[in-house]
Amino acid sequence: MNIEEIKNIKAKSNGTTLYEHTCMVIETGLKLLQSLSLSDRAQAFLKQNFLQAAILHDLGKVHPTFQKRLSGDKNASIRHELVSVWFAETFLEVNNAVLFAVATHHKSVESSSCNKSLSMQDLNGISISIDEGAYLPASEGTMCLETLQSWLSLFAEEFVYR
């Protein structure tokens, strides 16, 4: 998927694109981060981790099944945040805190007090599910390094590729 294709991917059923949504998340998060009284070192550390998590958090929405869901197909179901984790684990060197933030941005982990939870089995089983084709049909052509590189190039953030 090239840059122009990825810029037109929808993130919300109201037509908001993934790029627009991610830019809004980054802008809002950076304002919040700047409002905190933190040392320069802490600020820099949190900013780097936040930017990586923000840029990656909804990347799984490029998956064709998620796009079908946005188009109204009620039978299409996919955990886009787990696909986002798959991209990060497959192609990037990202720390566990960033992966955790991406994986749990819609659901908390089982041990928390929130009503919606993501089980550790969900997190541990993501690679197995993807390998078995449950999330990523190989014929779709969106789940590749080119898609990730196009996406990251929009934000000019430095990530270390595997």
Show which residues each predicted segment covers.
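Accessory nucleic-acid engagement/destabilization modules that flank
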Residues: 2-162
